């Protein structure tokens, strides 16, 4: 049964937390063009160029960084919107503009700390008594508070852009496991799987989250923060069920970039073999139920591992196109009244299965492999060492600006959050250099 929903959006979704009253002559840009410019010119975005997406052991400069991954996700995002406008023109007025979806894809990773998941786990452990740490929560915090475009509201993005960046619309206190593991005797013994963070918004940023969702009805607010089924164990985190239409498009673009483009990195860097591809992905893709994959999976494997750049690119492009053109807008299975929440972009079931196969393959053969995990573990130790040192004597070791922020806040959790903000903003190289300065016996 189709639901008739008005696509007239309240002007409140284009509002910013601060009116600003900027001195700009003849500025005819849309709110979302301005959002995109702020993200693109931010220090947080620039730092992504020195945060690696896949930690291989190659000396080449071919590999993707968080920045190139974000650029590719942005291109995919605008491609998804373009094909949706053609495929389902009735949603044209509801779909995000190119500038808006570009903004979301460019900004989606800016909260990720150095050393990927290793850095995230380390900061979450060190912040376990102070609200935790999580990359998506940090992204929201950067754009709403930390990036110094404005004095108090970060980049001061439009409300719709902020809603689109919130992948997990609930506070961490709501999604966090009932029980946490016991702290380890020594940080070297920390197991990453025990301290993977819950997903959501920091409780200390609740006022900003409340502002974003203020135009929603009480029923929509309650539904938006609804959890999936309660986990079986008290040590497992909860996850939210819903997200906005814009966020669903951004997430698909991110997943395709991860599942397909990171696969390309792994092949070029010699991290996966053709046999691994055949056993770990090709055989399952052939049985995923999608006619395109069933017909072309043999030639895709040949082209990916032919050693010829143009053939590999053709295979990658073919898979991306097959996934992208299988996306459509579908009604959400709960009665949201706001159209931004009532509809989501989804892959057809067979293609969703295919993308999961690709993501699992990348995780198993690219992320969870020995050499990558060694780099992540090393990064985990570097981040914990830095946090321990800086929190032990912040007035001595923090840089002047960060020290001032630390002194401005009153309670211990807020002070620890300042240190987490400082460390998470570092690039891989910055963290490594500071660690050497603090702990190396070599005179610098």
From Swiss-Prot:
KW Hydrolase (keyword) present: yes
Matching InterPro entries: dGTPase, dGTPase-like, dNTPase_2, HD/PDEase_dom, HD_domain, PHydrolase_assoc_dom
Entries under Pfam families matching the protein: HD (PF01966), HD_assoc (PF13286)
GO molecular function: dGTPase activity
Source organism superkingdom: Bacteria
UniProt keywords, alphabetically: Hydrolase
GO biological process, one term: dGTP catabolic process
SUPFAM superfamilies, sorted: HD-domain/PDEase-like
Keyword Hydrolase listed: yes
Residue stretches making up the HD domain: 66-259
PROSITE patterns xref list: HD
Entry similarity comment: Belongs to the dGTPase family. Type 2 subfamily.
UniProt name for this protein: Deoxyguanosinetriphosphate triphosphohydrolase-like protein
């Amino acid at each position: 049964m189709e639901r008739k929903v008005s696509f007239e959006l309240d002007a409140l979704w284009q509002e910013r937390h601060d009116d600003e009253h900027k001195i700009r002559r003849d500025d005819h840009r849309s709110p979302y063009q301005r959002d995109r410019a702020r993200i693109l010119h931010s220090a947080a975005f620039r730092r992504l160029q020195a945060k690696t997406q896949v930690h291989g052991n190659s000396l080449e400069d071919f590999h993707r960084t968080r920045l190139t991954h974000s650029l590719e996700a942005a291109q995919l995002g605008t491609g998804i919107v373009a094909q949706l406008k053609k495929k389902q023109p009735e949603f044209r007025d509801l779909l995000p503009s190119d500038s808006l979806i570009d903004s979301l894809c460019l900004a989606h990773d800016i909260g990720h700390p150095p050393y990927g998941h290793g850095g995230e786990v380390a900061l979450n452990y060190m912040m376990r008594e102070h609200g935790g740490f999580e990359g998506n929560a940090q992204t929201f915090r950067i754009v709403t508070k930390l990036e110094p475009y404005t004095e108090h509201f970060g980049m001061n993005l439009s409300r719709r852009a902020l809603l689109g960046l919130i992948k997990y619309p609930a506070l961490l206190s709501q999604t966090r496991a009932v029980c946490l593991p016991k702290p380890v005797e020594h940080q070297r013994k920390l197991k990453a799987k025990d301290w993977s963070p819950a997903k959501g918004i920091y409780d200390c940023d609740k006022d900003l989250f409340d502002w974003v969702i203020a135009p929603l009805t009480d029923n929509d607010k309650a539904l938006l923060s609804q959890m999936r089924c309660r986990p079986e164990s008290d040590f497992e985190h909860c996850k939210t069920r819903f997200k906005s239409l814009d966020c669903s498009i951004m997430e698909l673009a991110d997943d395709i970039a991860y599942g397909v483009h990171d696969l390309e990195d792994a092949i070029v860097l010699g991290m996966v073999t053709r046999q691994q591809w055949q056993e770990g992905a090709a055989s399952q893709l052939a049985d995923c139920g999608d006619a395109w994959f069933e017909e072309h999976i043999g030639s895709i494997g040949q082209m990916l591992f032919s050693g010829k750049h143009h053939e590999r690119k053709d295979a990658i492009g073919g898979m991306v196109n097959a996934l992208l053109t299988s996306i459509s807008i579908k009604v959400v299975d709960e009665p949201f009244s706001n159209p931004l929440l009532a509809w989501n972009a989804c892959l057809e079931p067979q293609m969703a299965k295919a993308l999961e196969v690709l993501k699992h393959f990348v995780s198993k053969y690219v992320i969870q492999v020995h050499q990558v995990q060694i780099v992540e573990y090393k990064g985990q130790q570097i981040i914990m060492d830095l946090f321990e040192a800086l929190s032990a004597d912040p007035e001595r070791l923090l840089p002047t600006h960060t020290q001032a922020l630390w002194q401005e806040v009153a309670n211990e959790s807020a002070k620890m959050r300042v240190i987490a903000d400082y460390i998470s903003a570092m690039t891989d190289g910055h963290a490594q250099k500071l660690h050497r300065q603090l702990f190396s016996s070599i005179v610098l």
